[in-house]
Swiss-Prot record:
Known partners and oligomeric status: Monomer and homodimer. Part of the essential Sec protein translocation apparatus which comprises SecA, SecYEG and auxiliary proteins SecDF-YajC and YidC.
Gene that this polypeptide is encoded by: secA
Essential cofactor(s): Zn(2+)
Segments for region (Disordered): 863-885
GO terms classed as biological process: intracellular protein transmembrane transport; protein import; protein targeting; protein transport by the Sec complex
Reaction it catalyzes: ATP + H2O + cellular proteinSide 1 = ADP + phosphate + cellular proteinSide 2
One function term, GO molecular function aspect: ATP binding
Cross-referenced SUPFAM superfamilies: Helical scaffold and wing domains of SecA, P-loop containing nucleoside triphosphate hydrolases, Pre-protein crosslinking domain of SecA
Bound cofactor: record note: May bind 1 zinc ion per subunit.
Annotated keywords: ATP-binding, Cell inner membrane, Cell membrane, Cytoplasm, Membrane, Metal-binding, Nucleotide-binding, Protein transport, Translocase, Translocation, Transport, Zinc
SMART domains given in the database record: SecA_DEAD, SecA_PP_bind
Name of the protein this chain belongs to: Protein translocase subunit SecA
Organism of derivation: Rickettsia akari (strain Hartford)
Amino acids binding Zn(2+): 890, 892, 901-902
């Protein structure tokens, strides 16, 4: 019934596209008049549009004329005229939706339309890409159009100094990678003045390959972290022990990606740990004193049994580098958290980096939801439309192609074993190669791509391998994959964003030419050669895309197919599968094996049957649903932290903007003074119950004041009067500092102390939230909702953090002095440069190994309350402990963390 209605009335997508086509006629009707304009008159349209907006017009009032202007500018500057379907794509993007356009339909050119229109407001537009190469390429190519029309263009890539970034972000249109945008957002919220920040307020973002960024990378947060204790030796010892375990010592679930020790395994590892002297002979792994070791053992188990080199990560230049499972690219600067990366480093016998503590983090889900207006484009989004709508409130509209798709998608072939599958793939590659038909072979991992490469080398078939190991050559290799007799093996969707043109890409070949006296002749020669090869390739059948196995997501399979049949070109696609493939083995093995037995699968024979295709699709849908729920669940939990993050970042900005730091200091001083006095002189208590001795100690610890015991000797004195006296004494301490250092310097010092203290407590709070999150799922066993419990406890922790902030801030303000000899403007400038350098260097490894937030004041602020060597602390005398980190073990020897022991009421 539903299918009949769709045929009669069309789908919702069909109706949307039909309506948009009617709007395109309005743009086309302006084309003739716009073409008559001189270059100068065309450029002046930008000034005219800005004036209209200034006088109250909206973007929708000028959208048709603006699009017509961009179309004409592109024709004059680049020789490219926007097709009608590209204009439709532009309207979809302008209206804050996602446009699905097939590979080769010119998405980069489409983005110029909404980017130009929205940049007219002067608030900036971000065009987001997945890597630096695409950001540079698109800003250079499309920048010519924007510059012609009088708009400025910026490009953000990794490693740029802040000055250059600031200029790029202040441009009308900025091309940047999703990673750099996210990290700049975090870095900006760690800066100590508004002038040091690089980003402008969020306005409008157009995300290229939107499915890759908002879905594939949604579960991986961007993290800026700093070093904690060095446990590299322990990781090495545990790694050697885990290598001695056998297959009966643990059990793993590949569907859920979990691994646990069995009873036999626990006994075995306890004997090994005892033998190495890591635990005492009469203790067990799960005894209280050894509980910290469980984490190291679990991560070593995961490293050895759940992670595979050249599949999940690779080792390059003595470093373990993560591979993106969806793109096959190395995830530069990313490290696994919770000690897993250190366990992998121990496994691969490379230098073990220090563990890190999170200083700031954000997921792409929450970063991109900061934009008031968001849109995106990709070749494959319809399969994920419900998720994009649910999480980002983004509708997806599929735009028809300019030319009809003539690509032929052949049925899958399924074999009993991997060897039989590879034999069939090799036979097809040989056939295609002999007739000159270019072939692109898609694999799901580096390991598989190199395995297949070895098979082709043995057969002496020339080919190129495109995977994370050759990331730098990615665009060049993929661009020439359509040449005559070209054989290219690509990891998953490596090279995405670069079109495969039949016959080859002349522009990339021309880029590498030497500009000598024969330069023009060489260009003509290359163009002629490419044109001839294109004819040969079309005659051979176009690009043949071969998939070596199905991915967990149908969308990734569709992306691979989409590399062929660009702009109406001929082409074919085919997937070869075996029962050994991960998807088949883990999710669909029983069902499909039964079907194959029924159909009578023989060695070396392939099965092609609709039942198998349906079973595979069901398996993929099951995995997609599971991954969607995981991302949705992640967002629910991350939203709790995100709300708190927004509050902290807003407060931080207010502090930086504030011209009067005395207000917060004054109110907090009064609040703490009252709290301390009431703690030792409770309301309604008898005078003999007052603890004046400890009141004096506490007032000195917090406010650096010497409290005179005689003040409470009067019989009629009340706790209110004592509170007023304490507040006045604290104010006197502050005034004496102002007289010594000047009001301006004190204002800067107080602001600096407040910011550094806020950063410290926020860092500790993130650590607490991480630990809370790790164990919260266990609440389900007590019939409690883990999310509700997490919200409740996270709120309590947040309140506790704010209380800690107040006390640590007040304590620091009243206990410091400044070395006036050294506070110079030059010092401030130098320290800021050092900070920027450290932050930039840390992008290579997101651990802020040298992170030292602050200005030169930090060097010259000398607090009386400092950290004391643990050996010098007396467990029975808290006054000898100095400052204790909330996550340290309490110096009283209770075995608890300080925040759960003596620090519980701070």
């Amino acid at each position: 019934m539903l299918s009949i209605l769709k045929k009669l009335f069309g789908t919702a997508n069909d109706r949307t596209v039909k309506k948009l086509f009617s709007e395109i006629t309005k743009i086309n009707s302006l084309e003739h008049a716009i073409q008559k304009l001189s270059d100068e008159e065309l450029k002046n349209k930008t000034v005219e549009f800005k004036e209209k907006l200034k006088n109250g017009a909206t973007l929708d009032d000028i959208v048709y004329e603006a699009f017509a202007v961009v179309r004409e500018a592109a024709r004059r500057v680049c020789g490219m005229r926007h097709f009608d379907v590209q204009l439709i794509g532009g309207l979809i993007l302008h209206r804050g939706m996602i446009t699905e356009m097939r590979t080769g339909e010119g998405k980069t050119l489409v983005a110029t339309l909404p980017a130009y229109l929205n940049a007219l407001t002067g608030k900036g537009v971000h065009v987001v890409t997945v890597n630096d190469y695409l950001a540079r390429r698109d800003s250079a190519a499309m920048g010519k159009i924007y510059n012609f029309l009088g708009l400025s263009v910026g490009c953000i890539v990794a490693g740029m100094p802040d000055e250059a970034k600031r200029a790029a972000y202040n441009a009308d249109i900025t091309h940047a990678t999703n990673n750099e945008l996210g990290f700049d957002y975090l870095r900006d919220n760690m800066k100590y003045s508004l002038q040091e920040r690089v980003l402008r307020p969020f306005n409008f973002a157009i995300i290229d390959e939107v499915d890759s960024i908002l879905i594939d990378e949604a579960r991986t947060p961007l993290v800026i972290s700093g070093p904690v204790n060095d446990n590299s030796e322990l990781y090495g010892k545990i790694d050697k022990i885990v290598r001695l375990l056998n297959i009966n010592d643990f059990e793993k679930d590949e569907k859920l990606k979990t691994i646990n020790l069995t009873e036999t395994g626990i006994t075995h590892i306890e004997s090994l740990l005892s033998k190495e002297g890591i635990i005492k002979p009469d203790t067990g792994l799960y005894d209280f004193e050894n509980l910290t070791l469980v984490h190291y053992v679990n991560q070593a188990l995961r490293a050895h049994n759940m992670f595979t080199v050249d599949v999940d990560y690779l080792v390059r230049e003595g470093k373990v580098m993560i591979i993106d499972e969806f793109t096959g690219r190395v995830m530069e600067g990313r490290r696994y958290s919770e000690g897993l990366h250190q366990a992998l480093e121990a496994k691969e016998n490379v230098k073990i980096q220090n563990e890190n503590q999170t200083l700031a983090s954000v997921t792409f889900q929450n970063y991109f939801r900061n934009y008031p207006k968001l849109s995106g484009m990709t070749g494959t989004a319809m399969t994920e439309a419900p998720e994009l709508k649910d999480i980002y409130n983004l509708d997806v509209v599929a735009v028809p192609t300019h030319n009809k798709v003539t690509r032929l998608d052949l049925d899958d072939e399924i074999y009993g074993s991997k060897k039989e599958k590879y034999d069939a793939i090799l036979k097809l590659i040989k056939d295609c190669y002999d007739r000159g038909q270019p072939i692109l072979v898609g694999t799901i991992s580096i390991e598989k791509s190199e395995e297949l490469s070895s098979v082709l080398n043995a057969e002496k078939i020339p080919h190129k391998v495109l995977n994370a190991k050759f990331h730098e050559q990615e665009a060049c290799i993929i661009a020439q994959a359509g040449r005559f007799k070209a054989v290219t093996i690509a990891t998953n969707m490596a090279g995405r964003g670069t079109d495969i043109m039949l016959g080859g890409n002349p522009e990339m070949l021309i880029e590498h030419l030497d500009k000598d006296h024969n330069y023009a002749a060489k260009i003509d020669e290359i163009k002629a050669q490419i044109a001839e090869e294109k004819k040969q390739v079309i005659e051979a059948g176009g690009l043949f895309v071969i998939g070596t196995e199905r991915h967990e997501s149908r969308r990734i399979d569709n992306q691979l197919r989409g590399r062929s049949g660009r702009q109406g070109d001929p082409g074919k696609t085919k997937f070869f599968l075996s029962l050994d493939d991960d998807l088949m083995r883990i999710f669909a093995s029983d069902r499909i094996s039964g079907v194959l037995r029924t159909l009578g699968l023989k060695d070396g024979e392939a099965i092609q049957h609709p039942m198998i295709s349906r079973s595979l699709e069901k398996a993929q849908q099951k995995v997609e649903g599971y991954n969607y729920e995981m991302r949705k669940n992640l967002l629910r939990f991350d939203d709790v932290m995100n709300d708190q993050r927004k509050i902290i970042y807003e407060q931080r900005t207010e502090i930086i903007k504030s011209k009067d730091s005395y207000g917060f200091l004054n109110s907090t001083t009064e609040e703490l003074a009252k709290k301390i006095v009431l703690a030792f002189m409770p309301v309604g208590s008898y005078r003999e119950d007052w603890d004046i001795e400890n009141l004096s100690v506490e007032l000195h610890r917090v406010f650096a004041i010497k409290f005179d015991h005689n003040l409470v000797s009067k019989s009629d004195v009340t706790e209110e009067e004592i509170t007023k006296i304490v507040i006045q004494m604290a104010h006197d301490v502050y005034k004496s500092k102002e007289e010594a250092y000047s009001s301006e310097l004190m204002h800067n010092a107080v602001k600096y102390i407040l910011l550094t203290t806020l950063d410290q407590v926020w860092k500790d709070h993130l650590y607490s939230l991480d630990h809370l999150r790790q164990g919260i799922s266990l609440r389900a066993y007590a019939q409690k909702d883990p999310l509700s419990e997490y919200k409740r406890e996270a709120f309590n922790l947040f309140e506790q953090m704010l209380n800690n902030l107040k006390e640590l801030f007040i304590q620091a303000v009243y206990h410091f002095h400044i070395d006036l000899k050294h506070v110079q403007k030059e010092d401030v400038s130098l320290e800021r440069k050092k900070l920027q350098n450290n932050m930039r260097e840390s992008r290579e490894d997101p651990a802020f190994s040298k992170y030292n937030a602050g200005s030169s004041l930090e060097t010259h602020l000398k607090p009386v309350v400092s950290r004391i060597d643990p050996k010098d602390r007396n467990p029975d005398d808290p006054t000898s402990w100095g400052r204790v980190s909330r996550n340290e073990l309490c110096p009283c020897s209770s075995g608890k963390k300080y925040k759960y022991c003596h620090g519980a009421h701070e």
